[in-house]
């Protein structure tokens, strides 16, 4: 019986890491796609429009599967998720990308695991072992060191916006993961999108440009990606992974996101991928493995 119980726990944890990894891969395209989109869309309109599109599909999913409304005590946590990942993070990153390059902004995402783990402790009641924090801090330092090695930003406003984006996103991730244990992974992001509808839908209409005739196909495709994949599909996998494998543990997979994102930026925006990126990626993978081992 004990052996079966251990196997089920291990299997659930492994599934959590797989789901979390899929979510990270999807999220990795968010900043390069946003960078392409803000070249032609106003950043505030882009944020509201991506949430509006995603919320329509979210409402459709909830209706098709006849999901029950959340309990009264779940609406406030859903509001926190909505403010963090539906509005806060997309808006702050879109504004930041007016000041800094896609590659520069991506490396700040390396701080997300630490932010998620901190809020996982504060909001989710998790208690990782001390060695976990060592690997988490080391991974974050490696990513930030890589960012600094590329040169300090000439636009501190962009850096500040990215740091704020990381904080609100970490809070939204941790709150959503905690809520997904009782509400369900995809249900959390869907209801969070629905909560945001009274704000994002009217603003999308109000802030819409007078004409869309000058918008290129890459900009439209980027809007579609951040609306459907970054805002909805990615979270289905991500929240399920966090709930299965633990917020602090699976959250360490975010350390890989900057490097996936840089690879996409190189392909989409023709930015150079250096040997240093490859070396730091290997080191960060080691930190992720160490964090996973000592997370519980």
Model-based region annotation:
Residues 25-55, 101, 171-195, 209, ...:
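Juxtamembrane helix-loop-helix junctions in multi-pass membrane proteins
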Residues 58, 116-118, 122, 136, ...:
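Transmembrane alpha-helical segments that form core, pore/gating elements
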Residues 29, 33-36, 40, 54-71, ...:
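Membrane-interface helix-cap regions at the ends of transmembrane helices
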Residues 25-26, 30-31, 59-109, 145, ...:
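Specific transmembrane alpha-helical segments of multi-pass solute transporters/efflux pumps
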Residues 2-48, 91, 151-178, 199:
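Glycine-/small-residue-enriched transmembrane alpha-helix faces in small-molecule transporters
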Residues 2-9, 49-51, 219-221, 255-296:
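C-terminal-most transmembrane helix of multi-pass membrane proteins
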Residues 48-49, 90, 104-111, 175-198, ...:
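Helix-helix packing/entry segments at the starts of transmembrane helices
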């Amino acid at each position: 019986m004990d052996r079966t119980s251990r196997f089920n726990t291990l299997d659930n944890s492994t599934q959590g890491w797989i789901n979390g990894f899929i979510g990270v891969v999807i999220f990795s395209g968010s900043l390069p796609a946003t960078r392409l989109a803000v070249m032609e869309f106003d950043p505030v309109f882009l944020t509201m429009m991506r949430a509006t599109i995603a919320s329509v599909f979210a409402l459709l999913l909830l209706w098709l599967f006849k999901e029950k409304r959340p309990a009264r005590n779940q609406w406030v946590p859903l509001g926190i998720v909505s403010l963090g990942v539906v509005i806060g993070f997309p808006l702050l990153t879109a504004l930041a990308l007016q000041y800094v390059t896609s590659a520069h902004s991506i490396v700040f995402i390396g701080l997300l695991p630490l932010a998620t783990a901190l809020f996982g402790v504060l909001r989710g009641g998790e208690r990782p072992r001390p060695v976990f924090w060592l690997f988490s801090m080391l991974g974050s330092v490696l990513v930030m060191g890589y960012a600094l090695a590329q040169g300090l930003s000439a636009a501190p406003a962009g850096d500040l916006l990215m740091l704020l984006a990381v904080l609100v996103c970490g809070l939204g991730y941790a709150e959503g993961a905690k809520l997904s244990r009782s509400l369900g992974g995809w249900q959390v992001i869907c209801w969070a999108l629905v909560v945001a509808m009274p704000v994002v839908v009217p603003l999308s209409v109000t802030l819409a440009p007078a004409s869309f005739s000058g918008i290129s196909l890459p900009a439209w495709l980027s809007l579609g990606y951040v609306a459907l994949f970054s805002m909805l599909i990615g979270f289905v996998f991500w929240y399920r992974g966090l709930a299965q494998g633990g917020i602090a543990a699976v959250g360490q997979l975010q350390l890989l996101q900057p490097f996936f994102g840089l690879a996409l930026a190189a392909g989409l925006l023709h930015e150079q991928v250096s040997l240093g990126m490859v070396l730091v990626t290997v080191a960060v993978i080691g930190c992720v493995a160490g964090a996973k081992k000592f997370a519980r």
